[in-house]
C-alpha cells in the first residue's frame, strides 16, 4: 500500500446542488485543491480528482469529488482506493453533519453513519466503517422541516457570511489530521467541555 491519502468530498453532482448544505464536503475539497495548487480533472472512477501534495513537503493526496449522487458514493470511493492502492485507513470522508452546529468541525474514525446515506454506501463499498471522517456542521433543520429538504437547500444569508471561515477551518482540520494524526486534530478542533 501507499502513503497517499484519499480525501473524498461528499455531495451531489450538478449546478443545482452546488450551494446546498449537503455539498459542503465538496466545497471543502475546492478549498483544499486551491492549497494543492491544481484543478480537478475527470477520472474513469466517476469522480473529479486532484493529485498533489498538501503544503511544501506535505502528504501526498488524491482529492476526489464523486460524480455520482451522494447515496451511491461508495463505488467511486472504492474504485479510487483500488486504483491508487490506498487502504481504508488512509481514506478521509469530508461530509455535512446535521448533529453538530453550523460552523463546527469534528473528526472521528469509524462508528455509525448517523443516517448519512453517503457514508453508509462508502462503508459498504470499503467493507469497513474504519475510515476517517471530517464532519462539517450544518446544524439541524428548524421546527418540523424535513431533514432531506433542509440539507438539499442552499445555506442561508447569515450562514453564507460565515461559510468561507467554516470551509477554511475544515480544510485546516484535514491538513492537521494528515500531518499530526487524529488525536492532535481532535484536540484542536473539539472544544474542551467546561465544568458546571
Swiss-Prot record:
Keyword Cytoplasm: yes
Site (Discriminates between blocked and unblocked aminoacyl-tRNA): 12
Subcellular location per the Swiss-Prot or TrEMBL entry: Cytoplasm
Active-site residues annotated for this sequence: 22 (proton acceptor)
Site label Stabilizes the basic form of H active site to accept a proton, positions: 96
Residues at which tRNA binds: 17, 69, 71, 117
EC number of this enzyme: 3.1.1.29
Any one GO cellular component localisation term in the record: cytoplasm
Reaction(s) the record says it catalyses: an N-acyl-L-alpha-aminoacyl-tRNA + H2O = an N-acyl-L-amino acid + a tRNA + H(+)
An annotated Gene Ontology molecular function: tRNA binding
InterPro entries linked to this entry: Pept_tRNA_hydro (IPR001328), Pept_tRNA_hydro_CS (IPR018171), Pept_tRNA_hydro_sf (IPR036416)
Keyword Hydrolase: yes
Major localisation: cytoplasm
Keywords, ordered alphabetically: Cytoplasm, Hydrolase, RNA-binding, tRNA-binding
Annotated disulfide bonds: none
GO biological process: protein quality control for misfolded or incompletely synthesized proteins; rescue of stalled ribosome
Protein family (similarity comment): Belongs to the PTH family.
NCBIfam families: pth
Quaternary organization: Monomer.
Function statement: Hydrolyzes ribosome-free peptidyl-tRNAs (with 1 or more amino acids incorporated), which drop off the ribosome during protein synthesis, or as a result of ribosome stalling. Catalyzes the release of premature peptidyl moieties from peptidyl-tRNA molecules trapped in stalled 50S ribosomal subunits, and thus maintains levels of free tRNAs and 50S ribosomes.
UniProt name for this protein: Peptidyl-tRNA hydrolase
Organism for this UniProt entry: Pseudarthrobacter chlorophenolicus (strain ATCC 700700 / DSM 12829 / CIP 107037 / JCM 12360 / KCTC 9906 / NCIMB 13794 / A6)
Gene designation per UniProt: pth
